[in-house]
Curated annotation (Swiss-Prot):
Residues 702-711 have a biased composition (Polar residues). Keywords: Nucleus, Ribosome biogenesis, rRNA processing. This is Pre-rRNA-processing protein RIX1. It comes from the Eukaryota. It comes from Debaryomyces hansenii (strain ATCC 36239 / CBS 767 / BCRC 21394 / JCM 1990 / NBRC 0083 / IGC 2968).
Length: 751
């Protein structure tokens, strides 16, 4: 519901009782500001500016937000944009620590909105924004200590949108950011602030006048060099030279020359580590975390120019971080203090955790570029899994549960780059870790009770106390209600494990042992979800895992479909397995005769059908329609004619009779020797010729020519007839051909 203009103007004349309805009316009703008169509009703008000039914090805040809403209207922005910008800059200049922080945040947000509304409009940009940009940048850099996250995000936007204007302020901002990164309180900064500092630093190469891509790549190399120098500090505590592979990796890192040290983009203070002050050892892990955060910002932030990313160099430095571990590299002999050893081990774990956070983001950004390095990445991630006596250290896995979940997430991200992975041995240990994390966790017996038990065994020869043993009461509860003493697995751990297993079973053919362990876990999860979940609320990760267990059964002979269907009965994919919906079967159309090649043959086939109907009516042939079609398809047609070389011969055409056998499957055709004196020639025209063979054993046979292809009645005991036709030797074909005699049986007409 919008307020009338008179009410708004009256309320803005002094301190507004409630600014929210006024702001809602001006923001939602787009036609409100277009329909009011110029006089009322001038009153509205002037009273908003007067409120922003007030010394009362509430009135100032109301005036700033009114300017923000009014600037969304183009007509007001074109006429009053300069006044709005000048008033906001004045508020920003006069801000100090004694003023309410909300005034600063509202002013910065209003300036950002005003710049966004003006940007892209050439006239307004030239007249309003461009002259004020240097002042805005300077004030933002001066006030960055009051609202660092908000102001740095605003500066980051100005760098991207106005790199040329920002160029004179680039070095000053870089030094300011390096000071923030080097401060002792950096580790206590909020994670959001750390991220925006690194992103702003990674955006600065865009202001370079020439070759910004070379500057960007040089910064990446400088970060890698700085990391290698920090990691070499561990050589004072660990015997790094004993690991030849590790030293080979260090040699692949470019060396920093003395002349290049002054040109390095990242100049941090030197680390002061005292072995007598073990807490100073954490400076190593803090510096590694800082450098990895900057590298992450460089690798993930978008640029307006093409860059060459040294992916191999980035992976090498991460492999070095993962390889520096007390499991593989022994301590030096002069390091004997157990406290120092534990602190060094803790710093290496922190370094590895920060490295995994960086590696987890790379597949999302670079995708296929990492596939050639996939086996190498999985290999050095595998060394992070704790082992004891060639088995996974269960207690160590649980004590570093967050680290292990992040490791599984990182591994799953790299597996997702490929559709299938042929070498399943690379993932066996990761699967074992995942299954360890989701096993039931029973609460261990406390050390106090263990100590008492040992004391009781040591003093067994003493007189037993006749008093009632009070310790038996809690022990009885432990035996009778053991399920109440199981530790609950965190939901984040369950989701991370399910996502990893879901990624594995869809891309890898696991060995039988790991396959059955994974499917055993899925059956247990499905049974628990069915029996103990009254609301049938199933997480998305578990739902996807159960569906994929049906789609990718692997070695499983018995399907999990019945159990999963009882849980996910409404799933459309599972309904296809339960009620298959196949397409209709194809319908075969019977062919009705021989293939017709042209229109003439089509007409002949019609005549043929008429003849067949007449024969059926006379009762001469008692066969059904299918046998007629079959005999018609199998019939052989032979046309015989005579023609002279000069074309004047009166010799009539002679056509060879067509013979159709009664049973072609049981009777064989026996051919006689060909008589070279007999020649057969096909006639150019065709007609039905009835010929009577003078031989006593032959019967009258109806000969079929090309013009009639109907069904021919066959006598019960047909006798083959040989017809010999003599043709003049002057014909083109001088060969002789004799129609063979066909013996169809021993029976004759005499019987």
């Amino acid at each position: 519901m919008s307020l009338p203009l008179d009410v708004i103007l009256e309320d803005l004349e002094s301190s507004p009782k409630s600014i929210i309805p006024i702001l809602a009316t001006l923001h939602r009703d787009k036609a409100f500001l277009n329909d009011i008169s110029k006089t009322d509009l001038k009153h509205l703008v002037s009273r908003s500016l007067n409120l922003s000039k007030s010394h009362i914090a509430y009135n100032k805040w109301c005036g700033i937000n009114l300017i923000k809403v009014l600037s969304n209207n183009y007509n007001i922005l074109a006429n009053e944009g300069v006044n709005f910008m000048s008033q906001l800059i004045k508020i920003l200049e006069n801000y100090n620590q004694s003023i309410d922080p909300k005034i600063l945040s509202s002013t910065v947000e209003c300036l950002n909105n005003l710049c966004n509304q003006i940007r892209g409009k050439p006239t307004l940009t030239r007249e309003v924004l461009t002259p004020k940009l240097p002042t805005i940048i300077t004030l933002f850099m001066e006030k960055v200590a009051y609202q660092p996250s908000l102001i740095l995000r605003s500066l980051n936007s100005l760098i991207r949108k106005h790199p040329t204007t920002f160029r004179p302020y680039g070095n000053k901002l870089r030094n300011r950011l390096i000071e923030l990164l080097s401060s002792e309180s950096y580790s206590a900064f909020p994670q959001e602030l750390k991220q925006i500092i690194c992103e702003t630093l990674a955006t600065l190469p865009i202001i370079e006048k020439t070759e910004p891509e070379a500057k960007w790549q040089g910064d990446i190399v400088d970060i890698v060099k700085e990391l290698s120098q920090v990691l070499l500090i561990y050589d004072e505590f660990l015997s790094l030279n004993d690991d030849s592979d590790l030293m080979e990796l260090f040699k692949k890192i470019p060396r920093t020359r003395e002349s290049e040290e002054s040109e390095s983009s990242f100049k941090f203070a030197s680390l002061e580590i005292d072995i007598n002050k073990p807490d100073t050892i954490f400076q190593i892990s803090d510096r590694v975390e800082l450098l990895l955060s900057i590298m992450k910002a460089y690798l993930l932030s978008e640029t307006q120019f093409s860059v060459r990313v040294p992916v191999g160099l980035v992976l090498i430095i991460n492999e070095i971080i993962c390889s520096i571990s007390t499991k593989f590299v022994p301590f030096r002999k002069d390091i004997r203090d157990e406290k120092v050893k534990k602190l060094i081990k803790s710093t290496t774990l922190l370094n590895q955790f920060n490295s995994i956070k960086l590696l987890s983001e790379l597949p999302i950004k670079y995708q296929g570029s990492l596939v050639p390095h996939l086996n190498n990445i999985l290999a050095f991630l595998e060394i992070l899994i704790p082992f004891s006596n060639k088995k996974i250290d269960y207690q160590e896995v649980l004590s570093n549960e967050i680290f292990m979940c992040r490791l599984l997430e990182c591994t799953g991200n790299f597996i997702s780059l490929v559709s299938s992975l042929s070498d399943a041995s690379l993932l066996i240990r990761f699967i074992d870790v995942a299954l360890c994390l989701v096993e039931e966790r029973a609460l261990n017996t406390s050390p106090v009770s263990d100590g008492k038990k040992q004391n009781q065994q040591a003093n067994g020869n003493k007189k037993k106390n006749k008093k009632k043993n009070k310790e038996s009461v809690p022990l009885s509860d432990l035996l009778s209600h053991q399920h109440l003493f199981n530790e609950t697995i965190p939901l984040s751990t369950l989701n991370a494990t399910r996502r990893f297993l879901n990624m594995v079973i869809t891309r890898v053919n696991l060995p039988p042992t790991q396959h059955y362990r994974v499917f055993r876990y899925m059956i247990i999860e499905a049974t628990v979800a069915k029996s103990y979940n009254k609301d049938q609320n199933i997480s998305q990760e578990l739902k996807q895992l159960l569906i994929n267990s049906v789609l990718y059964p692997g070695f499983e002979k018995n399907s999990m479909l019945p159990i999963i269907t009882s849980l996910l009965g409404d799933d459309p994919l599972l309904s296809v397995f339960n009620n298959p919906r196949f397409p209709p079967l194809p319908t075969y159309i019977k062919k009705s005769g021989s293939v017709i090649e042209d229109d003439e043959e089509e007409e002949e086939s019609e005549n043929e059908d008429e003849e067949m109907e007449e024969n059926e009516n006379d009762g001469s042939l008692n066969v059904d329609e299918e046998s007629q079609l079959e005999s018609s398809a199998k019939r052989r047609k032979i046309d015989i004619s005579e023609s002279s070389a000069g074309g004047g011969s009166d010799q009539p055409e002679t056509v060879l009779p067509g013979i159709v056998l009664e049973d072609t499957k049981t009777k064989e055709k026996i051919f006689t020797n060909v008589n070279p004196d007999s020649v057969i020639q096909f006639a150019e025209t065709s007609e039905i010729v009835e010929d009577v063979v003078p031989e006593p054993e032959a019967t009258r046979t109806e000969v079929v020519t090309k013009s009639s292809v109907g069904t021919i009645p066959t006598p019960e005991n047909p006798v083959a007839t040989s017809v010999s036709v003599s043709v003049d030797k002057n014909e083109h074909d001088e060969s002789d051909f004799e129609i063979p005699d066909i013996d169809v049986g021993d029976d004759s007409d005499d019987e």
